[in-house]
UniProtKB/Swiss-Prot annotation:
Organism encoding this protein: Saccharomyces cerevisiae (strain YJM789) (Baker's yeast)
Protein's job: Mitochondrial glycine transporter that imports glycine into the mitochondrial matrix. Plays an important role in providing glycine for the first enzymatic step in heme biosynthesis, the condensation of glycine with succinyl-CoA to produce 5-aminolevulinate (ALA) in the mitochondrial matrix.
One annotated GO biological process: glycine import into mitochondrion
Family annotation (HAMAP family): SLC25A38
Membrane topology: Multi-pass membrane protein
Solcar repeat coordinates: 8-87, 115-199, 221-305
Name this protein carries in UniProt: Mitochondrial glycine transporter
One GO location term (cellular component): mitochondrial inner membrane
Keywords per UniProt: Membrane, Mitochondrion, Mitochondrion inner membrane, Repeat, Transmembrane, Transmembrane helix, Transport
Protein backbone atom coordinates (compact mmCIF):
# COMPACT_ATOMS: atom_id res chain seq x y z
CA UNK A 1 0.00 0.00 0.00
CA UNK A 2 1.54 3.31 -1.05
CA UNK A 3 1.67 6.50 0.96
CA UNK A 4 -0.52 8.18 -1.65
CA UNK A 5 -3.20 5.52 -1.25
CA UNK A 6 -3.14 5.78 2.53
CA UNK A 7 -3.22 9.56 2.84
CA UNK A 8 -6.64 10.35 1.35
CA UNK A 9 -8.32 7.56 3.31
CA UNK A 10 -6.89 8.60 6.68
CA UNK A 11 -7.25 12.34 6.09
CA UNK A 12 -10.91 11.96 5.11
CA UNK A 13 -11.77 10.77 8.63
CA UNK A 14 -9.67 13.56 10.15
CA UNK A 15 -11.35 16.24 8.02
CA UNK A 16 -14.85 14.80 8.41
CA UNK A 17 -14.48 14.49 12.18
CA UNK A 18 -13.05 17.99 12.54
CA UNK A 19 -15.76 19.84 10.62
CA UNK A 20 -18.56 17.70 12.03
CA UNK A 21 -17.37 18.35 15.58
CA UNK A 22 -16.77 22.07 14.97
CA UNK A 23 -20.24 22.63 13.51
CA UNK A 24 -22.03 20.82 16.32
CA UNK A 25 -19.96 22.53 19.06
CA UNK A 26 -20.67 26.08 17.87
CA UNK A 27 -24.35 25.43 17.10
CA UNK A 28 -25.10 23.71 20.42
CA UNK A 29 -22.87 25.64 22.87
CA UNK A 30 -25.89 27.23 24.67
CA UNK A 31 -27.14 23.77 25.68
CA UNK A 32 -23.68 22.82 26.99
CA UNK A 33 -23.37 26.04 29.01
CA UNK A 34 -26.82 25.62 30.59
CA UNK A 35 -26.07 21.97 31.42
CA UNK A 36 -22.85 22.95 33.23
CA UNK A 37 -24.60 25.65 35.28
CA UNK A 38 -27.48 23.36 36.25
CA UNK A 39 -25.01 20.72 37.46
CA UNK A 40 -22.87 23.13 39.50
CA UNK A 41 -25.71 24.13 41.85
CA UNK A 42 -28.02 21.62 43.50
CA UNK A 43 -30.82 24.23 43.63
CA UNK A 44 -30.39 25.41 40.06
CA UNK A 45 -33.14 25.13 37.49
CA UNK A 46 -33.19 25.81 33.77
CA UNK A 47 -35.50 28.80 34.20
CA UNK A 48 -33.32 30.29 36.97
CA UNK A 49 -30.21 30.07 34.80
CA UNK A 50 -31.96 31.55 31.78
CA UNK A 51 -33.07 34.56 33.86
CA UNK A 52 -29.45 35.18 34.88
CA UNK A 53 -28.36 35.49 31.24
CA UNK A 54 -28.03 39.21 30.40
CA UNK A 55 -27.76 38.84 26.63
CA UNK A 56 -28.10 36.01 24.08
CA UNK A 57 -24.36 36.19 23.36
CA UNK A 58 -23.63 35.02 26.93
CA UNK A 59 -25.09 31.64 25.96
CA UNK A 60 -22.01 31.19 23.77
CA UNK A 61 -19.53 31.85 26.61
CA UNK A 62 -16.81 29.21 26.45
CA UNK A 63 -17.36 28.54 22.74
CA UNK A 64 -13.64 28.71 21.88
CA UNK A 65 -12.45 25.97 24.29
CA UNK A 66 -15.59 23.97 23.51
CA UNK A 67 -15.02 24.24 19.74
CA UNK A 68 -11.33 23.37 20.12
CA UNK A 69 -12.09 20.36 22.30
CA UNK A 70 -14.93 19.03 20.15
CA UNK A 71 -13.37 19.61 16.72
CA UNK A 72 -9.90 18.30 17.63
CA UNK A 73 -11.32 15.54 19.82
CA UNK A 74 -13.79 14.45 17.14
CA UNK A 75 -11.09 14.44 14.45
CA UNK A 76 -8.71 12.38 16.60
CA UNK A 77 -11.45 10.06 17.86
CA UNK A 78 -12.92 9.24 14.45
CA UNK A 79 -9.47 8.80 12.89
CA UNK A 80 -8.42 6.50 15.74
CA UNK A 81 -11.73 4.64 15.58
CA UNK A 82 -11.37 4.14 11.84
CA UNK A 83 -7.83 2.77 12.18
CA UNK A 84 -8.95 0.31 14.85
CA UNK A 85 -12.08 -0.80 12.98
CA UNK A 86 -10.21 -1.15 9.67
CA UNK A 87 -7.49 -3.20 11.39
CA UNK A 88 -10.10 -5.54 12.90
CA UNK A 89 -11.89 -5.85 9.57
CA UNK A 90 -8.58 -6.68 7.90
CA UNK A 91 -7.81 -9.39 10.47
CA UNK A 92 -11.18 -10.98 9.84
CA UNK A 93 -10.40 -10.98 6.11
CA UNK A 94 -13.25 -8.55 5.47
CA UNK A 95 -10.64 -6.12 4.19
CA UNK A 96 -7.75 -8.07 2.60
CA UNK A 97 -6.47 -4.82 1.14
CA UNK A 98 -7.35 -1.38 2.42
CA UNK A 99 -6.84 -0.02 -1.09
CA UNK A 100 -9.51 -2.28 -2.54
CA UNK A 101 -12.95 -0.91 -1.60
CA UNK A 102 -14.76 -3.89 -3.13
CA UNK A 103 -13.57 -6.09 -0.26
CA UNK A 104 -15.10 -3.94 2.47
CA UNK A 105 -18.45 -4.95 3.97
CA UNK A 106 -20.55 -1.77 4.01
CA UNK A 107 -23.95 -0.58 5.08
CA UNK A 108 -25.73 0.96 2.09
CA UNK A 109 -25.88 4.31 3.89
CA UNK A 110 -22.21 4.33 4.87
CA UNK A 111 -18.65 3.85 3.66
CA UNK A 112 -17.49 2.53 7.04
CA UNK A 113 -16.64 -1.18 7.49
CA UNK A 114 -19.19 -3.41 9.22
CA UNK A 115 -18.03 -5.23 12.37
CA UNK A 116 -19.62 -7.40 15.04
CA UNK A 117 -21.50 -5.79 17.94
CA UNK A 118 -18.70 -6.63 20.40
CA UNK A 119 -16.05 -5.15 18.12
CA UNK A 120 -18.06 -1.94 17.73
CA UNK A 121 -18.50 -1.72 21.51
CA UNK A 122 -14.81 -2.26 22.33
CA UNK A 123 -13.32 -0.07 19.58
CA UNK A 124 -15.68 2.79 20.41
CA UNK A 125 -14.87 2.63 24.13
CA UNK A 126 -11.10 2.28 23.75
CA UNK A 127 -10.75 5.04 21.15
CA UNK A 128 -12.81 7.45 23.25
CA UNK A 129 -10.84 6.71 26.43
CA UNK A 130 -7.53 7.35 24.65
CA UNK A 131 -8.61 10.58 22.96
CA UNK A 132 -10.41 11.73 26.12
CA UNK A 133 -7.11 11.63 28.02
CA UNK A 134 -5.33 13.63 25.30
CA UNK A 135 -8.00 16.35 25.24
CA UNK A 136 -8.65 16.42 29.01
CA UNK A 137 -6.88 19.77 29.64
CA UNK A 138 -9.18 21.47 27.12
CA UNK A 139 -12.19 19.83 28.78
CA UNK A 140 -11.27 21.18 32.23
CA UNK A 141 -10.74 24.70 30.86
CA UNK A 142 -14.05 24.52 28.96
CA UNK A 143 -16.09 23.47 32.01
CA UNK A 144 -14.61 26.16 34.26
CA UNK A 145 -14.97 28.81 31.59
CA UNK A 146 -18.70 28.03 31.29
CA UNK A 147 -19.25 27.98 35.06
CA UNK A 148 -20.25 30.99 37.18
CA UNK A 149 -17.84 29.81 39.91
CA UNK A 150 -14.88 31.14 37.89
CA UNK A 151 -14.82 34.56 36.22
CA UNK A 152 -12.01 34.02 33.75
CA UNK A 153 -11.64 36.84 31.25
CA UNK A 154 -9.40 34.86 28.87
CA UNK A 155 -8.10 31.37 28.17
CA UNK A 156 -4.63 32.49 29.29
CA UNK A 157 -6.01 33.50 32.69
CA UNK A 158 -7.80 30.15 33.04
CA UNK A 159 -4.66 28.17 32.17
CA UNK A 160 -2.47 30.24 34.52
CA UNK A 161 -4.92 29.96 37.42
CA UNK A 162 -5.32 26.18 37.12
CA UNK A 163 -1.57 25.60 36.84
CA UNK A 164 -0.74 27.94 39.75
CA UNK A 165 -3.37 26.54 42.13
CA UNK A 166 -3.37 22.85 41.20
CA UNK A 167 -0.32 22.15 39.06
CA UNK A 168 -0.41 19.92 35.99
CA UNK A 169 -2.77 17.51 37.75
CA UNK A 170 -5.43 20.22 37.70
CA UNK A 171 -5.70 19.90 33.93
CA UNK A 172 -6.63 16.23 34.32
CA UNK A 173 -9.08 16.74 37.18
CA UNK A 174 -12.04 14.40 36.85
CA UNK A 175 -10.50 12.18 34.18
CA UNK A 176 -11.62 9.01 35.97
CA UNK A 177 -15.26 10.09 35.95
CA UNK A 178 -14.90 11.45 32.41
CA UNK A 179 -13.50 8.13 31.20
CA UNK A 180 -16.24 6.21 33.03
CA UNK A 181 -18.76 8.41 31.23
CA UNK A 182 -17.20 8.73 27.76
CA UNK A 183 -15.79 5.24 27.18
CA UNK A 184 -19.05 3.35 27.91
CA UNK A 185 -21.00 6.07 26.10
CA UNK A 186 -18.85 5.80 22.97
CA UNK A 187 -18.90 2.00 23.03
CA UNK A 188 -22.68 1.89 23.40
CA UNK A 189 -23.11 4.62 20.83
CA UNK A 190 -21.03 2.92 18.11
CA UNK A 191 -22.75 -0.41 18.78
CA UNK A 192 -26.25 1.11 18.61
CA UNK A 193 -25.39 3.41 15.70
CA UNK A 194 -24.06 0.64 13.47
CA UNK A 195 -27.00 -1.62 14.35
CA UNK A 196 -29.51 1.16 13.69
CA UNK A 197 -28.04 1.77 10.24
CA UNK A 198 -28.84 -1.85 9.39
CA UNK A 199 -32.35 -1.92 10.91
CA UNK A 200 -33.69 1.55 10.11
CA UNK A 201 -33.99 1.08 6.32
CA UNK A 202 -36.22 -1.95 7.01
CA UNK A 203 -38.79 0.13 8.92
CA UNK A 204 -38.64 3.42 7.05
CA UNK A 205 -41.48 4.09 4.55
CA UNK A 206 -40.47 3.19 1.01
CA UNK A 207 -40.75 6.82 -0.12
CA UNK A 208 -37.63 7.61 1.94
CA UNK A 209 -35.53 4.86 0.34
CA UNK A 210 -33.76 5.80 -2.90
CA UNK A 211 -30.76 4.12 -4.53
CA UNK A 212 -27.92 5.54 -6.61
CA UNK A 213 -26.57 3.82 -9.78
CA UNK A 214 -23.88 2.01 -7.72
CA UNK A 215 -26.51 0.27 -5.57
CA UNK A 216 -25.97 2.32 -2.42
CA UNK A 217 -28.36 4.84 -0.93
CA UNK A 218 -28.60 8.35 -2.35
CA UNK A 219 -27.24 11.25 -0.29
CA UNK A 220 -30.78 12.09 0.87
CA UNK A 221 -31.52 8.53 2.03
CA UNK A 222 -28.12 7.90 3.62
CA UNK A 223 -28.26 11.25 5.46
CA UNK A 224 -31.75 10.41 6.75
CA UNK A 225 -30.67 6.95 7.92
CA UNK A 226 -27.35 8.05 9.43
CA UNK A 227 -28.69 11.16 11.18
CA UNK A 228 -31.73 9.36 12.63
CA UNK A 229 -29.53 6.47 13.79
CA UNK A 230 -27.14 8.94 15.43
CA UNK A 231 -29.91 10.78 17.31
CA UNK A 232 -31.56 7.58 18.60
CA UNK A 233 -28.26 5.96 19.62
CA UNK A 234 -26.94 9.08 21.33
CA UNK A 235 -30.18 9.52 23.31
CA UNK A 236 -30.03 6.04 24.81
CA UNK A 237 -26.28 6.06 25.49
CA UNK A 238 -26.50 9.53 27.07
CA UNK A 239 -29.22 8.51 29.51
CA UNK A 240 -27.29 5.44 30.68
CA UNK A 241 -24.08 7.39 31.33
CA UNK A 242 -25.64 10.60 32.76
CA UNK A 243 -24.52 10.04 36.43
CA UNK A 244 -20.86 9.99 35.39
CA UNK A 245 -21.29 13.36 33.68
CA UNK A 246 -22.66 14.95 36.86
CA UNK A 247 -19.82 13.46 38.95
CA UNK A 248 -17.22 14.67 36.45
CA UNK A 249 -18.59 18.22 36.42
CA UNK A 250 -18.72 18.49 40.23
CA UNK A 251 -15.11 17.28 40.52
CA UNK A 252 -13.86 19.80 37.96
CA UNK A 253 -15.74 22.75 39.47
CA UNK A 254 -15.07 22.04 43.17
CA UNK A 255 -11.85 19.96 43.35
CA UNK A 256 -11.25 20.68 47.04
CA UNK A 257 -14.69 19.35 48.01
CA UNK A 258 -15.00 16.46 45.56
CA UNK A 259 -11.66 14.65 45.52
CA UNK A 260 -12.55 11.42 43.69
CA UNK A 261 -15.39 9.76 41.81
CA UNK A 262 -16.59 7.55 44.68
CA UNK A 263 -16.53 10.42 47.20
CA UNK A 264 -18.52 12.59 44.79
CA UNK A 265 -21.07 9.86 44.12
CA UNK A 266 -21.70 9.13 47.81
CA UNK A 267 -21.87 12.84 48.67
CA UNK A 268 -24.54 13.53 46.04
CA UNK A 269 -26.63 10.49 47.01
CA UNK A 270 -26.33 11.15 50.76
CA UNK A 271 -26.66 14.95 50.91
CA UNK A 272 -28.95 15.53 47.95
CA UNK A 273 -30.78 12.65 46.25
CA UNK A 274 -30.24 9.98 43.63
CA UNK A 275 -32.08 11.99 40.98
CA UNK A 276 -29.41 14.69 41.24
CA UNK A 277 -27.06 12.25 39.51
CA UNK A 278 -29.17 12.94 36.43
CA UNK A 279 -29.01 16.71 36.89
CA UNK A 280 -28.75 18.48 33.56
CA UNK A 281 -29.83 15.36 31.67
CA UNK A 282 -32.39 17.21 29.57
CA UNK A 283 -29.73 19.68 28.38
CA UNK A 284 -27.16 16.95 27.79
CA UNK A 285 -29.72 14.72 26.09
CA UNK A 286 -30.76 17.49 23.71
CA UNK A 287 -27.16 18.48 23.02
CA UNK A 288 -25.79 14.96 22.60
CA UNK A 289 -28.61 13.80 20.34
CA UNK A 290 -28.43 16.89 18.12
CA UNK A 291 -24.63 16.90 18.22
CA UNK A 292 -24.44 13.27 17.11
CA UNK A 293 -26.95 13.89 14.34
CA UNK A 294 -25.02 16.90 13.02
CA UNK A 295 -21.47 15.60 13.54
CA UNK A 296 -21.98 12.05 12.26
CA UNK A 297 -24.20 13.18 9.39
CA UNK A 298 -21.48 15.57 8.19
CA UNK A 299 -18.71 13.05 8.92
CA UNK A 300 -20.29 10.19 6.96
CA UNK A 301 -20.93 12.36 3.89
CA UNK A 302 -17.48 14.01 3.91
CA UNK A 303 -15.78 10.62 4.21
CA UNK A 304 -17.63 9.45 1.09
CA UNK A 305 -16.55 12.57 -0.81
CA UNK A 306 -12.86 12.34 0.10
CA UNK A 307 -12.38 8.56 -0.15
Amino acid sequence: MTEQATKPRNSSHLIGGFFGGLTSAVALQPLDLLKTRIQQDKKATLWKNLKEIDSPLQLWRGTLPSALRTSIGSALYLSCLNLMRSSLAKRRNAVPSLTNDSNIVYNKSSSLPRLTMYENLLTGAFARGLVGYITMPITVIKVRYESTLYNYSSLKEAITHIYTKEGLFGFFRGFGATCLRDAPYAGLYVLLYEKSKQLLPMVLPSRFIHYNPEGGFTTYTSTTVNTTSAVLSASLATTVTAPFDTIKTRMQLEPSKFTNSFNTFTSIVKNENVLKLFSGLSMRLARKALSAGIAWGIYEELVKRFM
